[in-house]
């Protein structure tokens, strides 16, 4: 039997279909249709406030100088942010903290002892296209919370420096105990790499960015593209943030005067006992290329144009020396508060670090600017 769909049914179906995209377009997860309209109106008002010119000026001011935590340049950025917040009508203030931090007393030493002697650079080469890269206040490459140490030992390449990598080395008959390991950045936090190296008996750890992960194998390098150039290294903390973050001497508490401090021996549960040193990949290549020993286990090959070997023999020996100046140093948080109209017993905390290992245009001044 032939069924005939009535014109009225067709009209109703058409109307439902026509209005469905509009209804979907007006909804936002977590909001009713009416509330979604209000939310969009507020978002449009918010988006109308930022101006590219003011953002550019804020970024210029915040990145004018290298400003490592606890330095006068860091304090200057704190004052600038506080004053800007006050100009917006907020009651912003500076909060001081006394935090145990390290700076290098002298340039770290990474020296190839065998098969030839060569002292490697621990400073990044300046770029002609970027005058800021030659700023005299840029520190040598170093890792926050790395230990002081002076060791000479055979070198082992341990890939990303994670537990499966050490398992692969053990299967290849390579023991890292009493040796210096060189590992590449990636696949985990650098503090994990330092701890795993120490736990396996290594006496030192060198960390570099392999061009396979962050360099020419990924695309054009800076200044032509966004990837890491050959003479660039990655600074950063090697604190065991997975144990606890913040000041190592005041776990779980604010590092303010009057807060009890734990002993340095206790703090070693949160920071390495061995020297840890970052290196640019043009220098790291000089350490990896002469390695002998077993050929690379699966997944160990990077982007250098030669087969990676893991070493572990006396064919390649390295001298690693770090001399750190640890002290309690003053840091400054900028704190402002906006009281809401509803749910006054609940807090929304928005935070971001302001200090930087160098200029901080990417990490993290762009967030302050926005």
Task: Give short role names for the model-derived ranges.
Residues 41, 54-57, 61, 76-87, ...:
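Extracytoplasmic/secreted proteins, especially bacterial periplasmic and envelope-associated proteins
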Residues 37-43, 55-67, 266-269:
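Acidic/histidine-rich, surface-exposed loop or edge segments in extracytoplasmic proteins
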Residues 23-27:
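Boundary at the C-terminal end of the N-terminal hydrophobic targeting segment
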Residues 28-37, 48, 60-175, 180, ...:
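Noncatalytic luminal/extracellular "stalk/propeptide" segments of secretory-pathway proteins
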Residues 133-168, 244-364:
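Soluble metallo-hydrolase cores and metallopeptidase-like ectodomains found primarily
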Residues 50, 54, 59, 63-73, ...:
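Sec/Tat-exported extracytoplasmic proteins
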Residues 366-369:
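Conserved small/polar residues in nucleotide/adenosyl-binding loops
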Residues 9-21:
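Bacterial N-terminal signal peptides
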């Amino acid at each position: 039997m032939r069924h005939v769909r009535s014109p009225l049914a067709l009209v109703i179906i058409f109307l439902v279909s026509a209005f469905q995209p509009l209804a979907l377009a007006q909804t936002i997860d977590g909001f009713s249709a009416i509330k979604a309209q209000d939310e969009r109106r507020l978002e449009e008002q918010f988006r109308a406030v930022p101006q590219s010119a003011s953002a550019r000026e804020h970024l210029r001011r915040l990145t004018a100088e290298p400003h490592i935590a606890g330095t006068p340049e860091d304090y200057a950025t704190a004052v600038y942010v506080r004053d800007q917040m006050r100009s917006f009508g907020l009651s912003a203030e500076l909060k001081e903290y006394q935090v145990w931090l390290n700076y290098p007393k002298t340039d770290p030493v990474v020296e190839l002892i065998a098969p030839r002697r060569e002292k490697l650079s621990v400073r990044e080469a300046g770029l002609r296209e970027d005058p800021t890269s030659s700023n005299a206040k840029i520190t040598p490459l170093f890792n926050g919370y790395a230990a002081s140490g002076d060791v000479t030992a055979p070198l082992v390449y341990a890939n990303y420096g994670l537990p499966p990598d050490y398992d692969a080395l053990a299967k290849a008959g390579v023991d890292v105990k009493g040796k210096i390991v060189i590992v590449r950045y990636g696949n985990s936090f650098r503090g994990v790499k330092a701890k795993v190296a120490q736990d396996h008996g290594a006496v030192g750890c060198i960390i570099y960015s392999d061009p396979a992960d962050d360099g020419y194998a990924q695309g054009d390098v800076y200044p032509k593209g966004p990837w890491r150039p050959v003479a660039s290294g990655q600074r950063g903390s090697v604190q065991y943030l997975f144990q606890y973050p913040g000041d190592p001497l005041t776990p779980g508490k604010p590092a303010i005067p009057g807060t009890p401090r734990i002993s340095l021996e206790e703090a070693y549960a949160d920071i390495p006992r061995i020297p840890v040193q970052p290196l640019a990949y043009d220098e790291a290549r000089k350490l990896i290329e002469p390695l002998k020993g077993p050929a690379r286990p699966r997944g160990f090959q990077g982007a250098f144009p030669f087969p990676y070997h893991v070493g572990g023999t006396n064919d390649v020996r390295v001298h690693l020396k770090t001399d750190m100046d640890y002290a309690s140093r003053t840091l400054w948080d900028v704190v402002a508060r906006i009281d809401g109209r509803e749910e006054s017993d609940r807090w929304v905390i928005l935070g971001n670090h302001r200090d930087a290992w160098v200029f901080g245009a990417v990490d993290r001044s762009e967030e302050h600017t926005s």
